[in-house]
Amino acid sequence: MKTQNTPFKQIAKLGLLLLLTVAIVACAAYIPKPNTSMSWKEEVLLHDGSKIISHRFYNLYGGYDTQQGAVIDETVTFNLPNGKRIVWKSNYSDSVAEPNGLSHFYFDIINGVPYLATYPAGCIAYNKWDRPNPPQVLFKYMDNQWQRITLAELPSELINAQANVIVGNPDRSLLKPYYDVTAVNTKNAPISTPEYKTILGEPVKGGGGVTSCEVIVRYKCGWGGPGEFNRKYFERVCK
């Protein structure tokens, strides 16, 4: 005896296929994306017209093929005119309490001393660095290490200097192995927030940069606004 393929059974089969399709798509969405990396070299124009080459390497969390992924950390190697190499490293993890999350935008050498200008990459980093204004963190390289300096300690000829490295990291789908000075400037041209491309000599008033970030503090397992409510909340959820 033949079994009739009734409309009800057809609908049931279609429903089952739909559920299986949704389940497969949902499972695929939860497959962890592999960590990736990206690197390139760029030409850095110094204040005196000379040039050096830096090599930049980023570890990224997630992102298939050309997808960007979130930055885990970066390592920048500067090849100095005297043949020496110095390295700048920055970690972007919000889960650690230590100050981190700095993006560099300017490098130069004055009287043989390397200087680096950076900005906090996001509100958590800005609060980790005690909310500086101008919202930038400055360094010089002394005794084989990067040492934080104040704006007053920065050579005056570097005030108002414009970014001479690629700010942030290029889109992976458009990444090139090498960027000369012209290409670096082209990449930075669309940036309109002054503190991301200019060494500022005065505090920022208003604007859409990190100075507009609310005050947040570190709790046991996260960040939040100061106050009794958040303190009790994090005490409850932080196990």
Task: For the regions a language model picked out, list residue spans one by one.
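Phenylalanine-focused residue identity feature
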Residues: 8, 57, 78, 105-107, ...
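N-terminal export/targeting and maturation segments
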Residues: 27-87
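Structured domain cores in non-transmembrane regions
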Residues: 62-148
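N-terminal secretory signal peptides that target proteins for export/translocation
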Residues: 1-10
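Acidic, small-residue rich beta-repeat scaffolds with periodic aromatic anchors
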Residues: 109-239
